[in-house]
UniProtKB/Swiss-Prot annotation:
The keyword Disulfide bond applies. It comes from the Eukaryota. This is Dermonecrotic toxin LhSicTox-alphaIV1i. Mg(2+) binds at E25, D27, D85. One of its GO terms (cellular component) is extracellular region. The lineage of its organism: Eukaryota, Metazoa, Ecdysozoa, Arthropoda, Chelicerata. It is an enzyme of class 4 (lyase). Its EC number is 4.6.1.-. Gene3D superfamilies: Phosphatidylinositol (PI) phosphodiesterase. Its cofactor is Mg(2+). CDD domains: GDPD_like_SMaseD_PLD. GO terms for molecular function: lyase activity; metal ion binding; phosphoric diester hydrolase activity; toxin activity. The keyword Secreted applies.
Length: 278
């Protein structure tokens, strides 16, 4: 999976898909009442990027729906997976549940069109703080209450704070997410700091967990990876996805002889909740 990083304005969807992304990551901010507000990152952000692009969440979700709805003039068939980087820092452990409910209702209304022929992309809820696991509980509850529990088949989960894997598993279980129930595990650092500085130890532990008989992870992705050497290192470590500001770099690496016969770009027909076994 080539995961386009920080796609916060609608026009950037085409920009990143044109460069080779089959997945995008979008930042979502929240107000003091736990209501999502904008698709917005703000400063600081990755080097070589403008940090202030934004849309109102409703507007972005409407544009995203069009980009992932077959038959729409804006449809991009390559775009199969969307990661919502949920900026829950201003939420408390008690308001996280409310935030999840409100975001679930918002997705149902603006992305899934009330469950009637909305966008088809798979969705990952990515949360930076393990203490906010109740966001997931609230999100699931909102869809169940609305009578659209079936849409949870399209929803996966990630904690992005580089926490201990055992603690991450516990937080997921507290949220009502079973082991290997649509679980992606991220690991990474801003591109302003070399990925060599962070190293790949935790990535390798996550891959080992994914491949073990008693793990909790379905897929592993590494962020934010823009340099050719770092892409190769991540692929060699066995990741399923690479989050990047430069999708074309990942495309070029995948076309190298070492990887060409072994790896390919995922399509909509590839279930992102199934662990890949080569």
């Amino acid at each position: 999976w080539i995961m386009g990083h920080m796609v916060n304005e609608i026009y950037q969807i085409d920009e990143f898909v044109d460069l080779g992304a089959n997945s995008i990551e979008t930042d979502i901010t929240f107000d003091d009442n736990a209501m999502e507000e904008y698709s917005f990152h703000g400063v600081p952000c990755d080097c070589r990027r403008y940090c202030h692009k934004w849309e109102y969440t409703n507007t972005f979700l409407d544009g995203l729906r069009r980009a992932t709805t077959p038959g729409d003039s804006k449809f991009r068939k390559e775009l199969a997976l969307v990661v919502f980087d949920l900026k829950t820092g201003d939420l408390s452990s008690s308001t996280a549940n409310k935030g999840g409910k409100l975001f679930g209702q918002k997705l149902l209304q603006h992305y899934w069109k009330g469950g009637n022929n909305g966008g088809r992309a798979y969705i990952i809820l990515s949360i930076p703080d393990l203490d906010h696991y109740a966001f997931i509980s609230g999100f699931k509850e909102a869809l169940k209450t609305a009578g659209h529990e079936e849409l949870l088949a399209k929803v996966g989960y990630d904690f992005s704070g580089n926490d201990d894997l055992g603690s991450t598993r516990t937080a997921l279980n507290k949220a009502g997410v079973k082991d290997r129930e649509h679980v992606w595990q991220s690991d990474g650092i801003t591109n302003c700091v070399s990925t060599l500085f962070r190293g790949l130890d935790r990535v390798k532990k996550a891959v080992s967990n994914r491949d073990s008989s008693n793990g909790y992870i379905n897929k592993v992705y590494h962020w934010t990876v823009d340099k050719y050497g770092s892409v190769r290192d991540a692929l060699d470590a066995g990741v399923d996805g690479v989050m990047t500001n430069d999708p074309d770099v990942i495309v070029n690496v995948l076309n190298e002889s070492k990887y060409k016969g072994k790896l390919r770009l995922a399509t909509y027909d590839d279930n992102p909740w199934e662990t890949f076994k080569p």
